[in-house]
A protein has these predicted regions:
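Enzymes that bind and transform nitrogen-containing heteroaromatic metabolites
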Residues: 1-167
């Protein structure tokens, strides 16, 4: 199963500014960690470079990069298709868990969205002052909301959504 996980602003679907996340929401970070631990995560090179401590622990880290330059704690592939093929082979050999998470950035989200089975979104009500990176548009007719939890942390309202692709 291919899942996408992201924290986005409600109106413009903003996800970042200058290679940094827009929102630091503790429960969103906890949700991310709980969902992705023990699974494969796929990200672009810039997303990897934005991680403060490098590869995320207790996950299979895959980085998509135009170069095959080695990255400590990660597997590197030159395309999303190549990474998904390698992962599919490992799932078939029972060497990897079934669920795989796309964790960013914008280009990888856009490439993966047509293949995704599930979306885990945190929708933040407040638009950021600045943003230069955006999540692709989602066609609501293609997705069914299966879980919705409204929250408010430190005066910031947001919603956890889980969506499955309609058959």
């Amino acid at each position: 199963m291919l899942s996408i996980i992201a924290c986005i602003s409600k109106v413009h679907r903003a996800i970042g500014y200058k290679n940094r996340l827009l929102y630091a929401i503790p429960s969103d970070m906890t949700r991310f960690r709980m969902l992705t631990t023990g699974h494969t995560i796929i990200m672009g090179r810039k997303t990897f470079e934005s991680l403060p401590n490098g590869a995320l622990p207790n996950r299979r880290n895959i980085v998509i990069s135009k170069t095959r330059e080695q990255i400590t704690g990660c597997e590197v592939y030159t395309s999303l298709e190549e990474a998904l093929a390698a992962r599919k082979e490992e799932v078939g050999n029972k060497k990897a868990s079934d669920e795989c998470f796309i964790i960013g950035g914008a280009s990888i989200y856009e490439q993966a969205l047509p293949f995704a089975d599930k979306l885990y979104l945190t929708i933040v009500e407040k638009e950021p002052e600045h943003a230069d990176t955006f999540f692709p548009e989602i066609n609501p007719a293609e997705w069914e909301v299966t879980e919705k939890e409204m929250r408010n942390e430190n005066g910031l309202p947001f919603t956890f959504l889980t969506l499955y692709r309609r058959q």
